[in-house]
A protein has these predicted regions:
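Glycine-rich, charge-decorated loop segments at or immediately adjacent to ligand/cofactor-binding or catalytic sites
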Residues: 68-92
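Subtilisin-like serine protease catalytic core
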Residues: 1-7, 35-37, 56-58, 92-96, ...
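Active-site neighborhood of phospho(di)ester-bond hydrolases with catalytic His/Asp-centered motifs
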Residues: 26-29, 61-66, 99
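Catalytic-core regions built around general acid/base machinery
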Residues: 42-58, 85-89
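Extracellular S/T/G-rich loop segment that most often corresponds to the catalytic His/Ser-adjacent loop
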Residues: 85-189
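Subtilisin-like peptidase catalytic core
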Residues: 1-35, 39, 74, 211
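Short glycine/serine- and small hydrophobic-enriched flexible loop segments
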Residues: 143, 189-197, 213-216
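Catalytic metal-binding/acid-base residues of hydrolase active sites
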Residues: 31-33, 66-70, 102-105, 147
Length: 218
């Protein structure tokens, strides 16, 4: 396991290696275990510096906002859970495009459970910058990240019906459920790549700007 003091160096090296391989749009769906309440960390500083890249600004790094575990969700008022659980490092980086999760998924096949979030609402697993007071608003955009199923007695849980789907690392299973801000970040990277492919002359700053400023309120 990498010591947290070296997270910044690892991030810089990974972004540089990917850039040298031709990946100008990069996905970072991993965060620190700790939230630093928008304070700069070695991770976020390294991310900012790598994206700036000496003024070239020739990289777009899309970062997940971080997840709330289902055991930490207050089903009686999950919006307050989202407000109370702040974005994890390094997603507070100013130059990164930070992605949270919302959901349109509300179909549950198990009659004992009900979807917790209404269609178009923030995903119960998505963190926010609600408590920050430094003028930095994160995430900049949200994408589909799935919902959770709630039972008045049993534990709140994720279900395949309320999740997205992706290829599996398990060789015995070709597909598996995919949810929360990692899934949302993957969708955002896909969108960025499609915009850049159709408009190859656009700068990556323009791609980011188009994604943020063309977003609609959910």
């Amino acid at each position: 396991e990498t010591d947290s003091d070296f997270y910044g160096a690892v991030i810089e090296d990974a972004i540089q290696q990917a850039h040298e391989m031709g990946a100008s749009i990069q996905c970072m769906a991993v965060t620190d275990d700790i939230s630093y309440d928008c304070k700069s960390t070695s991770s976020s500083a390294a991310l900012d510096e790598s994206i700036y890249n000496g003024g070239n600004c020739d990289r777009l790094v899309v970062v997940s906002a971080g997840n709330i575990e289902t055991t930490e969700i207050d089903a009686s008022d999950y919006i307050e859970s989202c407000k109370a659980n702040v974005i994890k490092s390094p997603a507070q980086a100013w130059n990164a495009l930070t992605v949270g999760a919302y959901t349109e998924k509300t179909v549950v096949t198990d009659d004992r459970y009900k979807p917790l979030a209404a269609p178009g609402g923030i995903s119960p697993m998505s963190r926010t910058s609600w408590s920050w007071r430094n003028g930095l608003n994160k995430p900049e955009i949200v994408m589909e990240g799935g919902n959770v199923a709630n039972h008045p007695v049993l534990q709140t849980t994720t279900t395949p019906n309320l999740s997205l789907i992706s290829t599996s690392a398990d060789l015995a299973e070709s597909l598996e459920p995919f949810y929360a801000t990692s899934a949302a970040t993957a969708l955002a990277v896909r969108m960025a790549a499609k915009i850049k492919t159709v408009n190859p002359d656009l700068s990556l700053l323009s791609v980011r700007g188009m994604m943020v400023h063309s977003a609609r309120w959910t």
